[in-house]
Amino acid sequence: MVSVQINDNETIDKMLKRFKKKYERAGVLKEYRANAYFVKPSIDNRLKRSRSRRRAQRANEERNS
């Protein structure tokens, strides 16, 4: 769980900014979206393979440029 203590003489805006940063780094939203609905393992594997192919293709294009 992400928690932030407000420091002395710190504005609410700065505290919220620190909270948002910790929230993103902890991967709370990413985990929520991943677990929002059930995905069959076969479909999950297929998506992982296609993401991997795209990533490899982009890396290959960058090397050739």
Swiss-Prot record:
GO terms for molecular function: structural constituent of ribosome. It holds the Pfam family Ribosomal_S21. One of its GO terms (biological process) is translation. Keywords: Ribonucleoprotein, Ribosomal protein. The keyword Ribosomal protein applies. Signal peptide: none annotated. InterPro entries: Ribosomal_bS21, Ribosomal_bS21_sf. GO terms for cellular component: ribonucleoprotein complex; ribosome. Belongs to the bacterial ribosomal protein bS21 family. HAMAP family: Ribosomal_bS21. NCBIfam families: S21p. This is Small ribosomal subunit protein bS21. It comes from Chlorobium chlorochromatii (strain CaD3).
